[in-house]
Amino acid sequence: MENKSLQPPLPRSERRIRVLHNDVTIDSYGWLRDREDPDVLAYLEAENHYADEVTSYVAELKADLIAEIEKRDSCDGAPPPFQVGFFFYFQKSQSGLLHSAWWRRPVTGGPEELVFDPNTLPGAEVFYSLGALEPSDDGRYIAFSFDLIGNERYELRVRDMTNGREIWRDPSRAGRLVWAADNRTLFFTRERADRRQHDRVVRLDVETGRSEVVFEEVNERLALVVRRSGSGAYLFIDVIITSDMSSRIQRAAAEVWCLPAERPTDMWRRILARELGHEIYAEHWGNEFLFRVNDTGPNLRLVRTAIDDTSPSRWQEVVPHRAGITLEEIHVLEEHVIVLEREGIQPRLVAHHRNGRVGPSIVPVEHSCTVTVGLSAGGSYSCARHPYRVSALTYKICSFVTPDIFIQHDLLTDKSKVLYRTLVSGFEPELYEARVVMAKAEDGVEVPISIVARRDRGEDGPVLLNVYGCYGAQSLPAFFGWPSSMTARLSLLDRGVAFGIVHVRGGGELGRAWHEAATRDQKRLTHTDLIAAAECLVEHRFASRDGIVIEGRSAGGGTVLAAAVLRPDLFRAVLAEVPLADIIDTELDFTLPYALRETAEYGDPHLANDYQYLRSYDPYYNLTPDRRYPPTYIDAALHDSQVLYYQPARYVAQRRSKAVDRDPDLIFRTRMIGGHMGVSHGPGVAEEAAFRMAWILHRLGQSGR
């Protein structure tokens, strides 16, 4: 049973008055910003204690859910290794150890060799996250980066595989890593100390230990990515637009520079000048460059041009801009360009031969799914790899009801074969059905909802809806990873709860225009699209009126809090993980990480019109004492470098202060270890997921085991 007698904590109030654009606001909890203040830590611990005490009733159900999740997490086999040079690289789990280690074996056969074991890192038993793992072409050197705190500031190391010694360490926030073709020169991006922006490219000669900055970006709204072309022949520096996340892998750039990979000490050459509104992604293919560009429309087109003359007048069109079809990614093989495009939310892969022939096309059977080309080490800054001198395409497909399948498709014979199929213990896909439901928004636009439920589920049942809807990022159905996390969600489905992802405007699932339709002075469309989706499911008897729970992470957490402020009557409960709960205060402080990026999405509160619009929906400033909000679970991370812990903490304190009874159904927990992406490994991952699922089931009146 719930503990109703325990009083929720409330921190002290220190009234600070701010006058901006003739609007007077009172902030009573700004003092929570100081992470070193003992009173701040005491308040966070008090909230953690309250959360533990008042949710102790879910302990037995949580234990059952943990067992279910851990059973499904025990997959058979391992995904295919990726090849770099003379070696295949792969991960192997180790009995009794928390983390999988990296190994390799020669392509021609031979014994396996340990490359990197994160279990040997001091502190990795508490938290560990891989940044990148990049072998040199000849396999002599391995560059890798990792985070042991959770603040996503990755330490770089280089290991000499001939003797196993680490020959370079750089603790200064490394990003993307890439080797030149000489097998001794490593390029990497380095982050500014005062904000989350990789603004320098460093060249390191690992044999002499000499490093130097070779490129620096001064515009704080832009950042740098260094990468190697799919052919391996060129290196690129992308000056990326930090506010755009419309491609999961290939970020839009305002400017691109190139360098032959065999001549790493040469001067970098700019291949397309910076221009307002101009976005590009470059690849190398034979004697040409390929550009994915937005010069004729937001859905992008593909052009080819000579390497020595990249002026727009020399461009030849390969794939035109098309209404309703977004050109998401390009991947090069020796004789083919592979285009990953999406019509609506349906992905497809299209091969374009060097002779101009188009085809074959690969269209997944499932309408709403995730397709990934190539193989990757899986770290935050790892690049997907695909062999170049081949005629077969390797890709991965997954969905709500399809665990990861790795497929090789021969482009000459148009035949496919499965390389590896992930098997999930106890999962019977035929018991579940995935579909796409279209909801009509308040302005008549149709908003897709990808949804999954058991086939034997009746009408008017409970539903958990996930949402993000910012920066053009895509939230697509998958089986593993956020937001799908089906190894945990199946426990909800088996108890009659459906799960859906609402592809609201502001996200990038339907292309660039879909994102831009809900930015700045149209941002409220993100929230009203979510509301329309919930109402649609009720109207069509897919969801019961009192059975809708909404959840979101980060910017998506801000979305669900804003929707709950607009329509508290519509939602049974709300989960907001590391939520962007106070947009105005974040953007007023340009010393904060990502504050400048947020202005492109939400507007700039330093401007009167933008401020007034933000003021109309910012969750923190729209809490009122006369409204009862749905039961809400909020979490934060003390070392989060994206959404700083005090944003949700201030929201919780403000909401408690507005309620006569301090809102006992508001639960707030701060992780003292880890960062924005939560617990990194081990039992804690299943435990966090199980708690959330148990809390949802309790709020839906399904506390039984």
Curated annotation (Swiss-Prot):
GO molecular function, one term: serine-type endopeptidase activity
Domain of life: Bacteria
Taxonomic lineage from the root: Bacteria, Pseudomonadati, Pseudomonadota, Alphaproteobacteria, Hyphomicrobiales
Keyword Transferase: no
Pfam families cross-referenced by the UniProt entry: Peptidase_S9, Peptidase_S9_N
Name of the featured protein: Uncharacterized peptidase y4sO
Keyword Protease part of the UniProt annotation: yes
This protein's UniProt keywords: Hydrolase, Plasmid, Protease, Serine protease
EC number(s) per entry: 3.4.21.-
Gene Ontology BP, a term: proteolysis
